[in-house]
């Protein structure tokens, strides 16, 4: 299966690594650059740690930085995602809010483009606790049957809320090609 690339190839690489097949042998069979295979090995190693180690803050940070969802951690520990989420929050393993530097550090950038990451321990912005606002969920990436018209619905929702006096309207979206992700559409993105 490693010599036939399809949409399952990364899973086959992970299975091969779990079986103890070396990175070099997987490379010979798959022609996938060893650098990528080693990255998959790192993920497999963390999964094994999750299965066989005590779940503490350090291991949760490591897993979250590697991109593990609470559901995946729960599966490895034979617990529910809610239990993992509660434990994670109680241990203070929560993502930080970071600003995207749209000017590549050439000049100070003050933007409303934000993202969540487990790769930091402090927030780039502080939102006052007494500040109220509304979050509008965007349509996400374009796909067949869902496109510009759904994004336009997001934009019109934001504009309508602003016209009705809402000062803090944030949009959550994961498609940088959309109008709803333009910097001047909402308070925070």
Specify the residue positions occupied by each region the protein language model found.
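ATP-dependent carboxylate/acyl-activation modules
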Residues: 1-189
């Amino acid at each position: 299966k490693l010599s036939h690339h399809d949409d399952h190839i990364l899973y086959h690489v992970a299975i091969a690594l779990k079986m103890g097949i070396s990175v070099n042998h997987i490379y010979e069979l798959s022609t996938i650059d060893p650098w990528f295979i080693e990255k998959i090995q790192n993920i497999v190693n963390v999964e094994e740690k999750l299965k066989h180690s005590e779940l503490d803050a350090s291991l949760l940070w490591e897993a979250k930085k590697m991109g593990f969802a609470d559901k995946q951690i729960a599966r490895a520990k034979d617990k529910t995602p809610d239990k993992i989420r509660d434990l994670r929050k109680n241990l203070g393993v929560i993502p930080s809010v970071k600003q995207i530097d749209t000017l590549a550090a050439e000049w100070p950038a003050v933007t409303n483009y934000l993202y969540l990451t487990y790769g930091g321990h402090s927030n780039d912005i502080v939102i006052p606790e007494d500040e109220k606002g509304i979050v509008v969920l965007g349509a996400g990436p374009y796909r067949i049957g869902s496109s510009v018209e759904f994004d336009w619905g997001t934009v019109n929702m934001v504009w309508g809320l602003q016209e009705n006096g809402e000062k803090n309207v944030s949009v959550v979206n994961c498609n940088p090609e959309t109008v709803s992700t333009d910097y001047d559409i909402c308070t925070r993105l």
